[in-house]
């Protein structure tokens, strides 16, 4: 049985979750790094998944009108074929299609994700490797297609990219936004679809991990129910602000800012591991 989590740790980790969930820098990787470097232990995959419900509530509220319109449009198209060309109907299917890869892989490899995939050597390496992928997407992407131009193949490709985020250090938004840029989408269109695409996967992941988070059986920091609640509320508030900021930021700024940050962080963590300052597991 792991060590009990302190209130300071819960507050800090909830803040980290809110700040990093929607940025292409890997929230799960940051939670793992901050837990190990500052608190000497891992908060665990279940803590990560449950606090993600806070940030997911933020995206549900921020995009409430879009979500309501998409759901209504999807049902309208099901019963009225003349509406099946509407963007909202198509977007409903794109979210469903894009969720399948992460759902299947997440179920098949859930044990590996909770244990070996949280190794800091892997996380630091993926921070750097995927920074190069994001840089390539920014450089080669045409960035001309609006969200109205989304097609089913875009949903499949971006959904497959989202599945890469099962590896801490990759980043859910980093994977989907990069794929969108490679497909020619504008940064804003890629980011908007990325947020909508994340909703089913993250909600399912958080709900699936909820029982384990309250009664942890493995090693690492064990959060109490009240601590999980507070951390999740903090993640919600900061996550909401992060969504608004990112959507404004990507309109006029490139992804290179995040590339530089990821590389610096990855190098720092690799250095700490190589010198024995922190443990990889």
From Swiss-Prot:
It catalyses: di-trans,octa-cis-undecaprenyl diphosphate + H2O = di-trans,octa-cis-undecaprenyl phosphate + phosphate + H(+). It comes from the Bacteria. It holds the Pfam family BacA. Its EC number is 3.6.1.27. The chain crosses the membrane at residues 89-109, 120-140, 163-183, 194-214, 227-247, 258-278. Catalyzes the dephosphorylation of undecaprenyl diphosphate (UPP). Confers resistance to bacitracin. This is Undecaprenyl-diphosphatase. It comes from Rhodococcus jostii (strain RHA1). The gene is uppP.
